[in-house]
Amino acid sequence: MMADVIVIGGGLAGCATAYYLAADGVDVTVLERFDLNMLASGSNAGSLHAQIPHDPFVRYGEGWAKNYASTVSLLAKSITMWRGLGDELGADLEVKLRGGLLVARTAEDMRAIERKARHERAQGLEIQLFDRADIAREAPYVSEDMIGGAFCPDEGKANPFAATPAFARAARRCGVRIERQAAVLGIARTSRGYDVATSKGVFSARRVVNAAGSDAGRIAAMLGVDLADVQ
């Protein structure tokens, strides 16, 4: 059977990709080598972030931030989607958007946060700069050693144990086939698309999406693609 798209990986990215494709009428098969939501998608804090990551900003500087900044508006749009995602998928994802706080211990830390905030605000992200008094009032549980920080009111979290299964159920309702315990062993190009050899047999599709997370490098190498670790 020839699918339109094979999605390799049954985590959050893979199941969400399958759902949105199928909702648009695309015939999709998901291949998961273990079970859904088993690896990183099901073992994280569920954080929904929009701010530019602080440590890479400090490490790589303004040039890196300018390249990354265009991602901020995309992240902000994704959080807007999360607000209504539970209703769309018919599940309680336990989304709570109560804001995210990045704190500074030193004046140097605070200067970096202020520089970073300029890039974030330029992309339309709401950032409130806090001094020590603001932190004491809004986050009294934070150590008194922290002298300030940046607060983004749109950040929050979702339940990582609920999100992927909800996407998978919605994907199935749209006709997606999900194959568990289907470890990918090789991928071959054909005149019609791709043959994906797995531990459960060969699956064919016109296109392949690599959503394999930590295994993405190995999957890409099957097609001669090197996923370099680029910051």
Please provide the spans of the model-predicted regions:
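Dinucleotide-binding Rossmann-like beta1-alpha1 core, especially the glycine-rich loop
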Residues: 47-134
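N-terminal Rossmann-like FAD-binding beta1-loop-alpha1 element of flavoenzymes
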Residues: 3-30
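Helix-loop-beta segment of a Rossmann-like dinucleotide-binding subdomain
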Residues: 91-104, 116-117, 123, 128-132, ...
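Helical element adjacent to the flavin cofactor pocket in flavoenzyme catalytic cores
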Residues: 150-207, 211, 215-218
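Glycine-rich beta-alpha-beta "Rossmann" dinucleotide-binding loop(s) and their flanking helix/strand
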Residues: 218-231
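Glycine-rich FAD pyrophosphate-binding loop
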Residues: 22-44
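Hydrophobic anchor at the start of a short beta-strand
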Residues: 26-28, 127, 208
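Conserved Rossmann-like nucleotide-cofactor binding loop
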Residues: 13, 36, 215
